[in-house]
UniProtKB/Swiss-Prot annotation:
It comes from Burkholderia mallei (strain ATCC 23344). Disulfide bonds: none annotated. InterPro entries: Acyl_CoA_acyltransferase (IPR016181), Asp_Glu_LeuTrfase (IPR017138), N-end_Aminoacyl_Trfase (IPR030700), N-end_Aminoacyl_Trfase_C (IPR007472), N-end_Aminoacyl_Trfase_N (IPR007471). Its EC number is 2.3.2.29. It catalyses: N-terminal L-glutamyl-[protein] + L-leucyl-tRNA(Leu) = N-terminal L-leucyl-L-glutamyl-[protein] + tRNA(Leu) + H(+); N-terminal L-aspartyl-[protein] + L-leucyl-tRNA(Leu) = N-terminal L-leucyl-L-aspartyl-[protein] + tRNA(Leu) + H(+). It is found in: Cytoplasm. It comes from the Bacteria. This is Aspartate/glutamate leucyltransferase. The gene is bpt.
């Protein structure tokens, strides 16, 4: 029988953290990556996930992780403080250009039209990476499984000449945290290569966070050496989690020491200090 004093003090203290085996990095060619995973997943609710995101974790489906790579710290968790955010000229033009898009917020759900757009996006933007061959089941596991407060947002162009007909332009998955919105994944019409739908989506999320009185929009990881991640550095001010502390980040000056040294100064939530 377990003595009462041996019970976890909180659900967060019941989590365990382990490091995965090395695997090829999906962001930087020739690099080897590892992840630190929080388990068991059924204990990670919205409150706990908020604390994990503050510590640099993200999720893919019900899999909650953060980079834990030997000798590399290219992945920097970043967030936008919405009240301090000031759009630049290009972002203001993008916002004005797409203001006619109609956004519909819904619970996570499968839609064949969404999946078709996802496959078009993967084939155009990430051909050969594996995700361009995702089955419907893989798509659902990746984007539509969540144990926290998550939403699906679809953006459509309405055609007034066609009696309410519309064209799906973008789909975005968002987590609602205690201190902000977390952008999980976004895919959009790849045929308009200069439409800047991804930028518009972040601007939309910033406005939503303001309306909900939430202070941050979490953008996942920024990787200086990855051209696909470069757009995140265009949002100012941008805060990064460096040496275990959130601070305003200057992407041109960011000095990123090896991950092992950084993690030693970045305690896990709930007082955890190591990886099993």
């Amino acid at each position: 029988m377990t003595h009462p004093t041996e019970l976890p003090l909180s659900p967060l203290s019941a989590l365990q953290f382990y490091a995965t085996a090395p695997y090829p990095c999906s962001y930087l060619d020739g690099r080897v990556a590892r992840s630190q995973v929080a388990t068991p997943s059924h204990l990670i609710n919205s409150d706990i996930y908020t604390e994990l995101v503050k510590a640099g974790f993200r999720r893919s489906g019900v899999f909650t992780y953060r980079p834990y790579c030997d000798g590399c710290r290219a992945c920097v968790p970043v967030r936008v403080p919405v009240d301090a955010f000031a759009p630049n000229r290009t972002q203001r033009r993008t916002w004005k250009r797409h203001r006619a898009l109609v956004a519909t917020v819904a619970a996570l759900h499968y839609d064949e039209e969404h999946y078709a757009l996802y496959m078009r996006y993967q084939s155009a933007r990430h051909a050969g990476g594996g995700m361009d061959r995702d089955s419907r089941d893989q798509y659902e596991q990746f984007l539509l499984q969540s144990r926290i407060n998550s939403r699906l947002v679809e953006f459509r162009d309405l055609d007034p000449a066609e009696n309410g007909a519309s064209t799906l332009r973008m789909v975005s998955m968002i987590d609602i945290l205690g201190d902000g919105l977390s952008s999980v994944y976004t895919f959009f019409d790849p045929d308009e290569s200069h439409a800047s739908y991804g930028t518009y989506n972040i601007l939309w999320q910033i406005e939503q966070a303001k309306s909900l009185r939430l202070p941050y929009v979490y953008l996942g990881y920024w990787i200086r050496e990855s051209p696909k991640m470069a757009y995140k550095a265009n949002f100012h001010p941008l805060e990064g989690l460096v040496d275990g502390r959130w601070k305003v980040l200057d992407p041109t000056l960011a000095d990123l020491p090896p991950v092992d040294a950084a993690l030693a100064r970045a305690p896990l939530p709930g007082g955890h200090s190591g990886t099993r």
